[in-house]
Amino acid sequence: MTYDMKKYIRTDLEGFAGYSACKAPELVKTKNRIIKLDANENLYGAAPTVQKAMSTFDQYHIYPDATQFEIRRLLAEYTGVNMEQIICGAGSDQLIDLLLRLFINPGDEVINCPPTFAMYKFYTDLNRGTVVNVPRDAGYDVNIGGIKNALTPKTKLIFIAAPNNPTGTAISKEDIRQILDLGVPTVIDEAYYEFTGQTMVTDMPSYPNLMILRTFSKWAGLAGLRVGYGLFPPVIADYLSRIKDPYSVNIAADAAVRQTMLQREYMLETVKKIVDERKRLYTELSKFSWLKPYPSAANFILCKLLKGKAKDVQQALESQGILVRCFDAPMMENCLRFSVGKPEDTDALLKALGEMGE
């Protein structure tokens, strides 16, 4: 007997495109050393104590603490926010999904400011919300007037990445406050906070509609373990704690985060190195007549190609073992994004780009 399983699938997901993730290094065909500059990871890796803890840990057969008590205690110390207001998850992606599940009824509207992090739209679509795009201006700054004009009675959430991914654009606290003053629940995604030092945490008592997301993927070298956290008003944290998966942070990630927080000064030193290297990379990229780099407050630099095709450059770099991200979406046509690595990674990238321009 033949069954048509498709007829049982949600009709709104029939054309769902999914997310295009970065290529795994083991899938790259090259004889060269892989230099991974496509996913904004910390190429210095996790703290040595994390790696040592992982090699000696012997509790993998035990379920993790569903409340993430110790992680939240350490994060409360780090952020200055009460641990009851902290929710942890399997990456900040999971928290984005949870927020949309909590706030969105089918047809409710979510304000998105493209070009920006794709997961805001991804999870809004998945949760049957309606994405209302308010495009950024030519310099990739948020259009605050456009956000105000886009508000309707159906508006339930606003997402703002600060700084923005994939453009690296910063947004001032004053501009964020203008958005918060609209009174709509607003998510400020501080995934790259450690690279810029600007946070809205101290504004939380003044804005009960302010929610902040962060991650251990970018600064802490734990991208492969998938750990993120959010800082929420008490009432929202309470609801999220009820609907989240009970074991959303696995026991290996739990142990790694504890060690990272105990060794955070070590990791923050690597952040300083990356910020210094970002300045050098921006200066050097500016010397190429066929590249237009944009200022960045994160750990990557976006470049628009003024000559040639970004896809061709991406493929040429990949053939040499250098992985970078290519974009061709609206307002991102013919763009490449370079993660900032170690000095030797920058040297290899600049050498390869220089040879292409000859």
Curated annotation (Swiss-Prot):
It comes from the Bacteria. Pathway: Amino-acid biosynthesis; L-histidine biosynthesis; L-histidine from 5-phospho-alpha-D-ribose 1-diphosphate: step 7/9. Its EC number is 2.6.1.9. GO terms for molecular function: histidinol-phosphate transaminase activity; pyridoxal phosphate binding. Disulfide bonds: none annotated. Its cofactor is pyridoxal 5'-phosphate. The keyword Oxidoreductase does not apply. CDD domains: AAT_like. One of its GO terms (biological process) is L-histidine biosynthetic process. Pfam families: Aminotran_1_2. Keywords: Amino-acid biosynthesis, Aminotransferase, Histidine biosynthesis, Pyridoxal phosphate, Transferase. Gene3D superfamilies: Aspartate Aminotransferase, domain 1, Type I PLP-dependent aspartate aminotransferase-like (Major domain). The modification N6-(pyridoxal phosphate)lysine is found at residue 218. It catalyses: L-histidinol phosphate + 2-oxoglutarate = 3-(imidazol-4-yl)-2-oxopropyl phosphate + L-glutamate. Belongs to the class-II pyridoxal-phosphate-dependent aminotransferase family. Histidinol-phosphate aminotransferase subfamily. NCBIfam families: hisC. Homodimer. This is Histidinol-phosphate aminotransferase. The lineage of its organism: Bacteria, Bacillati, Chloroflexota, Dehalococcoidia, Dehalococcoidales. The gene is hisC.
